[in-house]
Amino acid sequence: MKKLFALILAALMVLGCVAVASAEQAQTLQLNWEEYAAEIEASEEAKAALSGDFVTMEEIALKIYIPAAFKQTELTDEDREAGYIAYFTMGEDKGVGIQYVDVGGMSLEEYAQRLTEEYGYECKDAVVNGLPALAYSFTENDRETSVLAFSTEKGYILEIAFAPTNDEGFAAVAAVLMASVQAAE
């Protein structure tokens, strides 16, 4: 498993550096699936390691690429009541959670302000495949979680959380998955 992450990390390191550099210049994180897909396609190791499919979330009209190494976890009634739409795991400690957050109709800007004021999170504006978003991270119990947040037409915030992103190998995988979020066709 560590070799798999090392291969993914090596294959995406150059692209990740370019994305970070351009994000710093523009002050807005720009993620584009076409760039990541081209980089993956150019590497046999990355293609093998990231083999998977797009999963469409009908209730949110978005899709996200999920590698075959991830398994969808069945949600409990409590999970659904907490707003979870889907949860994917890889191994025992790596995962992607997709959740609605009822924020009373807040905009992304208002939500960012709330996260900063109430929790001290540093939020960045983002555009993911043309969709306005908010990106932030937090650490709890030495485990970093990175989140993309999108505003919905119904006044909710849709959060897609990736953890642990302080694991370099998983951070590389999370970067690919973040860049894959796009409107469902």
Which stretches of residues belong to each language-model region?
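A short acidic-to-branched-hydrophobic micro-motif
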Residues: 87-110
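Signature of long, low-cysteine stretches enriched in small and polar/charged residues
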Residues: 112-157
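N-terminal targeting sequences that direct proteins away from the cytosol to non-cytosolic compartments
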Residues: 6-8, 15-81, 154, 162-185
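Short, hydrophobic/aromatic-rich segments at coil-to-beta transitions
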Residues: 49-55, 81-86, 128-137
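Glycine-centered tight beta-turn/hairpin loop motif at sheet-sheet or coil-to-beta transitions
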Residues: 57-61, 91-96, 140-143, 155
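N-terminal hydrophobic targeting signals that begin at the initiator methionine
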Residues: 1-2
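A short, polar/proline- and glycine-enriched secondary-structure boundary/capping micro-motif
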Residues: 108-110, 146, 169-173
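Second-shell loop/turn segments in exported
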Residues: 56, 97-104, 123, 137, ...
